[in-house]
């Protein structure tokens, strides 16, 4: 139960403030919702390749939120392991947009369709970006720590490498959304089908404000919410086919 989880998470000497409790409850509920979403994807999505990649996206989001819980609740803010868990946030941030590209390539195709091998080359920059992030302690080209690395959690600056990661995340997200809209040929409900594009535009705006330091928000929660909304809106609007009685949507 939620009570048991909270008891295990906070020891008896902790002072539980309402903000802490509400934050922990939100994280637990978010993970539960994502697990349920993955199960529903298995039952709803017709194309097995799209189904597989959507489930992988769900697993990555669960990983993202779980890593966040471990970092903030079980580790000291000066623990080096916490810094690498912070870097681990970027595993889903880099891989989820890539899986989105694969999803859109399979959209509307036969079950035996195999995407061109050239798309596998996208794994190269993905893994290169991950290596770049996890070696940040050496080159400091993603994050810089003006007050020393021991204070990484409180005082850090974004460097040029961070904006490359943002560009990857946003550009592939736009590619996913635009290509779904281009492939769709349903004559009605265009306003609802444009919802994924609207979500992506709002996401880009939030990312820009966050990167410039104007907006202070929970990055992991925001990104998971945006991703889930984007994918579910594509399913509900028929841009990704499901077993809910839609006619042919793609050429």
Q: Which sequence ranges carry the predicted segments?
A:
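Hydrophobic core of alpha-helical transmembrane segments in multi-pass integral membrane proteins
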Residues: 1-8, 25-38, 124-134, 169-178, ...
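Individual alpha-helical transmembrane segments in multi-pass integral membrane proteins
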Residues: 17-32, 47-133
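Interfacial "cap-and-anchor" motif at the non-cytosolic start of specific transmembrane alpha-helices
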Residues: 181-249
């Amino acid at each position: 139960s939620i009570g048991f989880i909270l008891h295990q998470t906070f020891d008896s000497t902790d002072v539980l403030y309402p903000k802490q409790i509400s934050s922990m409850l939100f994280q637990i509920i978010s993970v539960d919702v994502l697990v349920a979403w993955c199960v529903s994807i298995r039952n709803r999505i017709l194309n097995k390749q799209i189904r597989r990649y959507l489930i992988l996206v769900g697993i990555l989001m669960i990983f993202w939120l779980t890593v966040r819980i471990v970092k903030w609740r079980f580790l000291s803010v000066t623990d080096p392991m916490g810094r690498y868990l912070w870097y681990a946030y970027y595993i889903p941030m880099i891989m989820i947009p890539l899986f989105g590209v694969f999803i859109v390539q399979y959209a509307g195709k036969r079950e035996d369709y195999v995407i061109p091998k050239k798309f596998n080359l996208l794994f190269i920059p993905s893994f290169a970006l991950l290596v770049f992030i996890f070696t940040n302690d050496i080159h400091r080209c993603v994050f810089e720590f003006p007050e020393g690395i021991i204070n990484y959690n409180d005082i850090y600056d974004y460097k040029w490498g961070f904006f490359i990661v943002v560009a990857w995340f946003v550009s592939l997200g736009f590619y996913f959304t635009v290509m779904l809209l281009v492939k769709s040929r349903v004559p009605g409900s265009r306003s609802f089908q444009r919802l994924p594009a609207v979500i992506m535009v709002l996401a880009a705006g939030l990312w820009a404000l966050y990167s410039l330091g104007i907006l202070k928000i929970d990055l992991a929660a925001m990104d998971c919410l945006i991703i889930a909304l984007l994918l579910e809106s594509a399913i509900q609007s028929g841009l990704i086919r499901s077993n809910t009685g839609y006619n042919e949507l793609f050429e």
